[in-house]
Curated annotation (Swiss-Prot):
<dbReference type="GO" id="GO:0009306">
    <property type="term" value="P:protein secretion"/>
</dbReference>
<keyword id="KW-0964">Secreted</keyword>
<comment type="similarity">
    <text>Belongs to the SVBP family.</text>
</comment>
<keyword id="KW-0206">Cytoskeleton</keyword>
<dbReference type="GO" id="GO:0061564">
    <property type="term" value="P:axon development"/>
</dbReference>
<dbReference type="GO" id="GO:0005856">
    <property type="term" value="C:cytoskeleton"/>
</dbReference>
<dbReference type="GO" id="GO:0005576">
    <property type="term" value="C:extracellular region"/>
</dbReference>
<dbReference type="Pfam" id="PF15674">
    <property type="entry name" value="CCDC23"/>
</dbReference>
<dbReference type="GO" id="GO:0010596">
    <property type="term" value="P:negative regulation of endothelial cell migration"/>
</dbReference>
<dbReference type="GO" id="GO:0005737">
    <property type="term" value="C:cytoplasm"/>
</dbReference>
<dbReference type="GO" id="GO:0007420">
    <property type="term" value="P:brain development"/>
</dbReference>
<feature type="compositionally biased region" description="Basic and acidic residues">
    <location>
        <begin position="1"/>
        <end position="23"/>
    </location>
</feature>
<keyword id="KW-0963">Cytoplasm</keyword>
<comment type="function">
    <text>Enhances the tyrosine carboxypeptidase activity of VASH1 and VASH2, thereby promoting the removal of the C-terminal tyrosine residue of alpha-tubulin. Also required to enhance the solubility and secretion of VASH1 and VASH2. Plays a role in axon and excitatory synapse formation.</text>
</comment>
<feature type="coiled-coil region">
    <location>
        <begin position="5"/>
        <end position="52"/>
    </location>
</feature>
<comment type="subunit">
    <text>Interacts with VASH1 and VASH2.</text>
</comment>
<dbReference type="GO" id="GO:0008017">
    <property type="term" value="F:microtubule binding"/>
</dbReference>
């Protein structure tokens, strides 16, 4: 195989490689975005639970006469 033929062959693979790399990058970004949304949702739930527990604690700490 002569050098010009190798060059042409590598040029054919290059666009497919770039497309595959772009797909991987896009999938990675989607995964990161989904994980971030899940973390925010979990944080919101945990904050609400913490507030409920704190309110319950405050009620228990109040003297019965108040």
């Amino acid at each position: 195989m002569d050098p010009p033929a190798r060059k042409e062959k590598s040029k054919v693979k290059e666009p497919a490689f770039r497309v595959e790399k772009a797909k991987q990058k896009s999938a990675q970004q989607e995964l990161k975005q989904r994980q971030r949304a899940e973390i925010y949702a979990l944080n919101r739930v945990m904050t609400e639970l913490e507030q409920q527990q704190f309110d319950e604690f405050c009620k228990q700490m109040q003297p019965p006469g108040e």
